[in-house]
């Protein structure tokens, strides 16, 4: 999706609305196209923000659940992440039976995974790239995060690309077209996955936004190619 025009394509995307996280709420009003070829995911703080409860903080999330799912392929986002402490932007995949209470605890990602293609934390110099597998229940989730030390600065106010290549044999992460990490050690998921584009509060340094302020995650495009070829 190149996010052209002024209306989000709801044939492809779902928009979370009136959903509550313990730190904030999701609102459809915080997801919109700017008419210049960008999707805006706005993080906003109302004038009546309550720091103790998180009431009055809003963000947006879009997903392709039940509208577009894919197995293997190449997944890429081009975006300017949030440039505010206390916030983070994310592009990720969720596939298989991760949310199934009976998900197999077999030490492999064959039956499902969550792939955080990128999570950007402004208070850190390096973004996060992580794979979770074996379900979310009964403390059986397994995770592997990859070192990003020495990567070029992504918090410069410019667009950057973040991608994930998923083949039957390997996972590979890329930033600005450069492979940053490869792995196959946890097994390769062979189940369809859907996409999520989201922005979040918390666990990202000191929260500095004040009532009435906002900070934007600016997305130029999200692209999926069936072939995971180099």
Regions flagged by a language model, labelled:
Residues 1-230:
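GH16 jelly-roll
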């Amino acid at each position: 999706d190149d996010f052209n025009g002024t209306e989000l394509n709801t044939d492809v995307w779902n928009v979370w609305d009136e959903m509550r996280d313990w730190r904030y709420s999701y609102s459809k009003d915080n997801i919109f196209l700017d008419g210049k070829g960008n999707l805006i995911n706005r993080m906003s703080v109302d004038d009546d923000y309550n720091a103790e409860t998180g009431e009055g903080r809003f963000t947006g999330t879009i997903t392709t659940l039940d509208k577009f799912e894919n197995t293997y392929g190449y997944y890429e986002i081009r975006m300017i992440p949030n440039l505010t402490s206390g916030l983070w932007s994310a592009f990720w995949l969720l596939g298989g039976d991760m949310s199934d209470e009976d998900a197999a605890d077999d030490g492999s990602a064959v039956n499902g995974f969550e792939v955080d293609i990128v999570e950007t934390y402004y208070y850190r110099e390096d973004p996060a790239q992580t794979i979770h597998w074996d379900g979310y229940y009964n403390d059986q989730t397994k995770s592997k995060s990859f070192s990003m030390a020495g990567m070029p600065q992504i918090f410069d106010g410019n667009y950057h690309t973040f991608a994930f290549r998923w083949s039957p044999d390997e996972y590979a992460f890329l930033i600005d077209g450069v492979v940053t990490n490869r792995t196959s050690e946890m097994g390769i998921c062979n189940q369809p996955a859907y996409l999520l584009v989201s922005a979040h509060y918390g666990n990202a340094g000191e929260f500095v936004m004040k009532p009435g302020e906002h900070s934007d995650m600016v997305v130029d495009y999200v692209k999926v190619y069936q072939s995971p070829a180099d």
